Design a protein with these regions (language model features):
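Short substrate-entry loop that stabilizes the transition state in hydrolases
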Residues: 23-25, 30-68, 196
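Structural recognition of the beta-strand scaffold that forms the well-ordered cores
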Residues: 27-31, 54-59, 98-100, 122-127, ...
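Short, proline-enriched alpha-helix->beta-strand connector loops that line the catalytic pocket
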Residues: 169, 179-186, 258-262
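C-terminal catalytic histidine-bearing segment of alpha/beta-hydrolase fold enzymes
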Residues: 189, 195-198, 205-284
Length: 284
């Protein structure tokens, strides 16, 4: 389908499935990864169709390598517009709208948690990045292609990162919509080996630091709810479990923390989404 942007009038493509049910059904909004667009293969699509749930996979300015991409105002607006389109064109239970993504899609999922105009029931963000300033340094050191993408996203010149634009496109520097937590939840999942050579490009510190930021912003007083520096260093050094936690999809959970509908899970894995678990947990 084609969806017109309310900001600049450009047409955004999306894959869209609408339920055949006469009863309103949930809407799954699945967000593509960093280097891809709406046409990317998406297992959430198949699982949604099998359950006959409404589903949309928007383009939101395509791969993250242009000034319009990377969680810009246009990106937020495009994803919101895709939700409007689904509501207008399918039998959507608007009390059950879910947003999910991994990697760059996890980044976009967190951006939507922070800034979407819609009332979303649950956000599920897998192996996200949240800080373009830090990620630029991390990818540049490892000579990964993402460093050049970040320069392109931030209107940087002469290979010098435009830090002002990078900050504006990094959810860790945004204001937390505290009131949203009265009706929505955010799950952040990260494979504990992500960020290590051969296991993925996004260090686990992105998820940990964002989780801690949210707890600071909501005024969480219980220090055990935060990920402490000691816990963070233990995970980075040993990559071992910090207690006895449940497993997910047969994977050991190394750390689980929660506060006020915000949950953080670090599991035995790398830069990945555990597809069947992620879908079932989303719609539960």
């Amino acid at each position: 389908v084609d969806i017109e942007s309310p900001i600049d009038g450009s047409l955004q493509k999306a894959y869209f499935y609408k339920t055949r049910s006469s009863k309103p059904q949930p809407l799954i909004v699945s967000l593509h990864t960093w280097s891809f667009d709406y046409s990317q293969y998406d297992s959430i699509n198949i699982q949604s169709a099998e359950k006959d749930l409404n589903y949309i996979h928007p383009d939101f300015r395509g791969p993250n390598k242009s000034k319009d991409a990377c969680c810009s105002d246009l990106v937020i607006s495009d994803i919101d517009a895709s939700i409007d389109f689904a509501i207008d064109n399918a039998n959507v239970d608007t009390s059950k709208i879910f947003i999910i993504g991994n990697s760059g899609g996890g980044y976009a999922t967190i951006a939507m948690f922070m800034r979407s105009k819609h009332r979303i029931k649950k956000f599920s963000s897998w192996v996200p990045l949240v800080d373009l300033l830090r990620w630029y340094d991390e990818t540049k050191i490892r000579k990964l292609e993402y460093a050049n993408d970040i320069l392109s996203c931030t209107q940087s010149v002469n290979n010098i990162l435009n830090e002002d634009v990078a900050k504006k496109k990094s959810p860790i520097y945004w204001e937390t919509p505290i009131e949203k937590l009265n009706y929505t939840s955010l799950d952040i999942y990260t494979g504990v080996y992500d960020g290590m050579i051969g296991n993925g490009p996004i260090p686990i510190t992105h998820s940990i630091n964002f989780y801690n930021k949210l707890l600071n912003d909501i005024g969480e007083k219980d220090k055990t709810k935060f990920v402490s520096d000691k816990e963070k260093l233990f995970l980075l050094e040993y990559r071992k479990a910090l207690g006895n936690f449940d497993s997910i999809s047969g994977r050991e959970v190394f750390l689980f923390k929660e506060s006020n509908n915000i949950r953080l899970t670090l599991f035995d894995g790398g830069h990945e989404i555990l597809k069947e678990f992620a879908f079932q947990q989303l719609i539960k």
